[in-house]
A protein has these predicted regions:
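Short, flexible/disordered secondary-structure transition segments
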Residues: 219, 351, 404-411, 436, ...
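Short, flexible coil/linker elements and helix-boundary hinge sites characteristic
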Residues: 7, 45, 53, 146-147, ...
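C-terminal single-pass membrane-anchor helix
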Residues: 414-449
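C-terminal membrane-proximal segments flanking the terminal transmembrane helix
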Residues: 67, 382, 386-387, 401, ...
Length: 450
């Protein structure tokens, strides 16, 4: 258990494979470009837990992208496909709905076999570094806030980056295999009493939720609340008033349904706006709010809710949707693995600090389950299977640590035991003490008589 907590049992490593399609180049040219680009990438990377590995995609069967998942020429998953295409200028174009990066190059940029550097290789390496910089920073931040060994903790992040990532962790809702989404319409009057939310969700939200299916499932419900008054009033809402806008005492917003986390998305009918501009805002780990005068067009609101959902689930803020989802898988896997490992360490330290504490069989079973799935999560780190095993391990670790019978013992110090048992020992102790005193007096009397 301590080995997991101290990072000796598993070293989180994310070797991302990137496939290069270079059909326009000869074999020796593409191989030389790959080696040159790989050297440039290695020189730029100073974080050993997250590194990019290039490979050439065989032109015979090529690489394809299916449902946002890339496969190399031999069916292996890759994080990104780079397609090298001849052009009149050097530029990169990342496709919005596929993990494919089109890199255009000029003929004079193809490196010769005798050259050790290449402007094209440098350009590709810098582009890849920028694309995965946010993911690398996320994983580095998770490691820096865990109990990993000092040699595995990356160098300190820039203050502004660390601050941004701290807000990211505060904003993101806890990972769950299933989330419940509640879409609510609140109006201060009797109108509108209905809205075309089903069609809007079907057209603009369901495609996003389907793309999340490897990571999480979603259930949805909707509601309309009439004569709803917000917690604050006024035409201009100050930023410090936004958290009080939700009238929790009167608005029927369930915090959870069926044991799964609930994410609330709320449209309020009114003419109010936020100080400084804007009519929507995000509430960390809760949901999003939009104020608009009518509901004639729900498309902008649903698109805003989609962006807020991505933010609440912890997805990075840039690049194409498939890359953001794959990054989320890797980051969530690392976070759950580190959290479960830390919980195991806390449980081990607890048993050492309180040697008299009894360990129920359910806790022992939970520890065994956690360690088993931690091992499987470490082996499959970065993939769907690794994420699922990390989730099971984290849930089992939390359940074992907060076992109610053990919690009661932890918060039952020796002073409380004395207070409980002393009244019971009093009736027994007094006759014993008096009997001892009587026997001592009798012994002393007999001794004087001698």
């Amino acid at each position: 258990m301590k080995d997991w907590a101290e990072g000796r049992a598993c070293r989180p490593v994310f070797p991302l494979r990137i496939s290069i399609e270079a059909d326009s180049l000869q074999d020796h040219e593409s191989q030389h470009l790959l080696r040159t680009t790989q050297h440039a990438l290695d020189d730029l990377n100073d974080f050993s837990a997250h590194h990019l590995r290039l490979q050439i995609s065989p032109p015979a069967n090529g690489s394809v992208a299916v449902d946002g998942q890339s496969t190399g020429g031999e069916g292996e998953e890759v994080a990104l496909i780079i397609r090298l295409l001849p052009g009149t200028e050097t530029k990169a174009d990342l496709q919005a709905y596929a993990p494919i990066l089109d890199v255009y190059y000029t003929p004079n940029q193809v490196p010769s076999s005798s050259s050790s550097t290449s402007s094209l290789a440098t350009y590709i390496a810098n582009t890849l570094r920028d694309m995965f910089a946010e993911e690398q920073a996320m994983i580095a931040y998770l490691l820096s806030t865990s109990s990993s060994p000092p040699e595995r903790i990356p160098k300190a992040l820039a203050p502004e980056v660390a601050e941004s990532l701290a807000k990211w962790t505060t904003r993101s809702i806890k990972y769950s295999r299933t989330y419940h989404l509640t879409f609510s319409l609140f109006t201060p009057t009797a109108t509108p009493s209905s809205w075309e939310i089903e069609k809007a969700l079907e057209d603009h939200m369901k495609p996003l939720l389907e793309s999340f299916s490897p990571i999480s499932n979603f259930t949805i419900d909707t509601q309309v609340q009439l004569y709803a008054q917000p917690g604050v009033s006024g035409a201009i809402l100050k930023k410090q008033d936004l958290s009080a806008f939700i009238n929790a005492a009167e608005w029927p917003l369930s915090p959870s349904i069926g044991g799964h986390p609930t994410i609330n998305f709320l449209i309020y009918i009114g003419d109010m706006s936020v100080e400084g501009g804007g009519t929507s805002w995000l509430i960390p780990q809760w949901g999003g709010v939009i104020i608009q005068p009518d509901i004639t067009d729900l498309r902008p609101a649903i698109l805003t809710f989609s962006n807020q959902l991505m933010s609440l689930l912890g997805a990075p803020s840039s690049h194409s949707l498939p890359l953001r989802l794959n990054t989320l898988i890797r980051v969530r896997s690392a976070g759950l693995l580190l959290k479960a490992s830390g919980t195991m360490g806390s449980l081990a330290r607890l048993t050492v600090a309180l040697p008299s504490i009894s360990i129920p069989q359910s806790v022992a079973d939970g520890v065994a389950t956690t360690l088993f799935h931690l091992g499987k999560a470490c082996d499959g780190l970065g993939g769907i299977e690794g994420l699922e095993n990390a989730r099971i391990a984290e849930e089992a670790a939390e359940k074992a640590f907060f076992e109610k019978s053990m919690v009661g013992q932890v918060y039952f110090p020796d002073e409380h035991k004395v207070a409980v048992y002393l009244p019971l020992l009093g009736p027994v102790g007094v006759p014993l003490v008096m009997g001892v005193v009587k026997e001592v007096k009798a012994w002393r009397k007999r001794r004087r008589g001698l």
